């Protein structure tokens, strides 16, 4: 059994100013066998990179297309790869929805 809640560390600057490298996120799994993920446009998600399945990415779910979710970086100037490079991401690759950033407690 996989836990419904898990944690992920942000590794890149692609989601600044909302999230920064070193931030820790609490994530709720969206994959329930037999059910599509319950997501809305604007939510931050953790997904498997379509071209590198062992790599997790943190992106904003921009819209749902016929091929899956269009995932976008908040900071495209950081050079991060998102759906502009790899297209829509199938729902099966969306691992979870970010509930909150729990570390650091405050930014100074």
Where do the model's predicted regions map?
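Extended hydrophobic leader/signal-anchor segments used for secretion and membrane insertion
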Residues: 1-108
């Amino acid at each position: 059994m996989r836990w419904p809640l898990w944690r992920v560390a942000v590794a890149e600057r692609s989601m600044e100013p909302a999230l920064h490298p070193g931030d820790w996120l609490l994530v709720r799994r969206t994959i329930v066998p037999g059910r599509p993920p319950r997501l809305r446009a604007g939510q931050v998600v953790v997904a498997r990179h379509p071209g590198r399945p062992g790599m997790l990415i943190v992106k904003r779910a921009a819209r749902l297309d016929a091929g899956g979710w269009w995932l976008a970086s908040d900071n495209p100037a950081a050079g991060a790869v998102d759906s502009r490079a790899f297209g829509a991401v199938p729902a099966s690759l969306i691992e979870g929805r970010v509930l909150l950033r729990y570390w650091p407690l405050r930014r100074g």
